Every structure is written in C-alpha cells, then in structure tokens.
C-alpha cells in the first residue's frame, strides 16, 4: 500500500542534461528501480535518436517502461501515470526505491499532482481530428477550432499540431472546452513522499552537450536507424515522428540536403527543444533540489546526501 510516507525520487530536466546516467548512479547507491518518464523512450522505435539508455547502462540497475509500446500506440499522460503507478508499487513491494526520470513534464506532473478529469476520448474522434488536421493544415484547423473553442484557440499557437488536435478532440467529445476541464480539481496522483531533482545546466554547456550527443548518435548509426524507420511508412502524425533529428536525417536520406546541413539543423532543433524544456521545468515543477553546475563527483555526493536525508526523515 502506498502513502505519503513512501519515498520516491524524480529526476527531471531538459534533454542531454545527464538524467539517465544520474538515475543509474542513484539506483545503485540506494537500491532503486529506474522508471522511464520520457514519452519517446516508451516506444520500441529509434533507440539512438530517442537517447534510450544503452543495454550496458540498463544492466547496471533495473529499468522499467523503456520500449514497452509499439510506435503506433499512443501513450497519454493518464496511461503512462497508470503504468508508472504499477511499477512504483512493485518497487515498494520489493523494498526498492522508485526513481522516475525523463523530460516529459506532463508525465511527471500527472504522477505527482494528478490530471484533470477529462473523459476518455473515443478513438473515432481522435482519428477524425488527425484526418482533419492533415487535410486542412494547421492555420485552417486553428480557425475551425476557434469557432468551437475560442478559449483554447486563443491560448494555442497554430504551429502546435498535437495540442490543436487535443483541444478539438475534447470539445467535440465532451461539449466543453479543454480550458474548462483543466480548471477542474486534479485526480489520480500517486501518494508518495517525493524528492524531486531538476537538472538545469547553464545554457552554453547544455547546448554543447546537445550537439556532441547528436553527433555521437550519427556516428553510432542514427542514419541507418532512420532509414529503417522511414521504410515502415508510419502515419506522419504519430508522436514518434517528432523524435529529435528524425526529420532532418530523413531529409538527407531523401536527397533533399547534405549531411552537414542536416546535422546542423538537427542540433539547432535539439537546442531549441532543450531551451523550451528548461523553461517549462523552471516554472512548472517545484523542485526539492535544482542543480545547475556540472555533474561532478562532488555534486553527486551532495545529491546522495540530500536523498539520504529525505529517506531518513519521517513525514
């Protein structure tokens, strides 16, 4: 049985900030289970581009919820929250510490704070939203949304396909604006004594890490990975299609650009995404500890000390 006396650790932060490696260190120090909180790494596609931990790293500590769904299956925050709750309960039952790590902020908020009680949207309506968006284009779809849900249309940028579709699905299925649902009290949070660590590297260092990691992915075979993925001809609106670097490397493979240009564009896209993630975590997540400096042995020792104090402190 879970309660607020049961401890759990969250490691959040932007891409390339060092979350996965730190999670393994914490798991080995405290007898933990690493639970994936990254929406791309849930799928069993594009392991290099999604920065899924390598098999050697995963062998160092138990890892859960990595590559557990095909890329054609959607993993909403509610679905992930339910899967994570089961893994956390199993960890506690085994006397182990759940360590949730990833950059999908909505996943982490879902498990820590709960979700607005939006009813399950029928797949037929979800499919209709995707079809309409593909046929109409973002701008026209945004205008159509404004007629049915002006509140969300005002909040959303026309370039955000996924959120536009979500807003349309909700108002179509429920007759209420997504904004109204989001104002409802949240439900379904996992009761735990949370220790949340946010990695927030200084931007020059984070951007350098983004670039060096992507170039390492290319060296390790990301082009072949994308070639094989493109051969599957999956629907273009699947979330996995937004894996950082996929579009740019696919353009190179199609002869639309040279490799250096593709890599530069992918690195820029990764930096942009990391910047957005960092901003989101700074404003949306209440952190027990924020670490901005380089992940040195000294800093890791400090993190271990803070976690140990948290584990020993009764609620």
Curated annotation (Swiss-Prot):
Residue ranges, annotated region (Interaction with substrate tRNA): 38-41, 162-166
Gene3D superfamilies in UniProt: 1.10.20.140, P-loop containing nucleotide triphosphate hydrolases
GO annotation terms (biological process): tRNA modification
EC number: 2.5.1.75
Cofactor(s) required, per the database record: Mg(2+)
One Gene Ontology MF term: tRNA dimethylallyltransferase activity
Ligand binding (ATP): 13-20
Entries under InterPro entries matching the protein: Dimethylallyltransferase, IPT, P-loop_NTPase
Site (Interaction with substrate tRNA): 104, 126
UniProt cross-references to SUPFAM superfamilies, sorted A to Z: P-loop containing nucleoside triphosphate hydrolases
Transmembrane residue ranges: none
Keywords (A to Z) from UniProt: ATP-binding, Magnesium, Nucleotide-binding, Transferase, tRNA processing
Reactions catalysed: adenosine(37) in tRNA + dimethylallyl diphosphate = N(6)-dimethylallyladenosine(37) in tRNA + diphosphate
Coiled-coil spans in chain: none
Binding positions (substrate): 15-20
Job description of the protein: Catalyzes the transfer of a dimethylallyl group onto the adenine at position 37 in tRNAs that read codons beginning with uridine, leading to the formation of N6-(dimethylallyl)adenosine (i(6)A).
Assembly mode: Monomer.
Family (UniProt): Belongs to the IPP transferase family.
Protein name: tRNA dimethylallyltransferase
Organism for this UniProt entry: Paramagnetospirillum magneticum (strain ATCC 700264 / AMB-1)
């Amino acid at each position: 049985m879970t309660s607020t006396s049961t401890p759990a650790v969250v490691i959040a932060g932007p891409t390339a900030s060092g979350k996965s490696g730190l999670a393994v260190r914490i798991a080995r120090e405290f007898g933990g289970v690493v639970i994936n909180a990254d929406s791309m790494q849930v799928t069993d596609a594009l392991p290099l581009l999604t920065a899924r931990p390598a098999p050697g790293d995963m062998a160092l500590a138990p890892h859960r919820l990595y590559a557990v769904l095909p890329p054609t299956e959607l993993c909403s925050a509610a679905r992930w929250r339910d899967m994570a709750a089961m893994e956390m309960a199993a960890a506690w039952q085994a006397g182990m510490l759940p360590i949730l790590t990833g950059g999908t902020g909505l996943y982490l908020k879902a498990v820590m704070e709960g979700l607005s009680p939006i009813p399950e949207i029928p797949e037929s309506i979800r499919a209709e939203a995707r079809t309409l968006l593909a046929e109409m284009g973002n701008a026209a779809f945004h205008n159509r949304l404004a007629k049915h849900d002006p509140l969300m249309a005002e909040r959303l940028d026309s370039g955000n396909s996924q959120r536009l579709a979500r807003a349309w699905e909700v108002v179509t299925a429920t007759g209420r604006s997504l904004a109204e649902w989001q104002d409802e009290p949240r439900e379904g949070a996992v009761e735990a004594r949370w220790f949340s660590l946010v990695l927030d590297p200084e931007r020059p260092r984070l951007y350098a890490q983004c670039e060096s990691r992507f170039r390492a992915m290319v060296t390790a075979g990301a082009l072949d990975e994308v070639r094989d993925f493109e051969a599957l001809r999956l629907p273009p609106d699947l979330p996995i299609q937004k894996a950082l670097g996929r579009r740019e490397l696919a353009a190179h493979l199609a002869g639309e650009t040279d490799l250096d240009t593709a890599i530069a564009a992918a690195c820029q896209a990764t930096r942009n995404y990391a910047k957005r993630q960092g901003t989101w975590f700074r404003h949306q997540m209440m952190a027990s500890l924020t670490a901005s400096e380089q992940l040195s042995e000294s800093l890791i020792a400090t993190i271990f000390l803070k976690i140990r104090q948290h584990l020993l402190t009764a609620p």
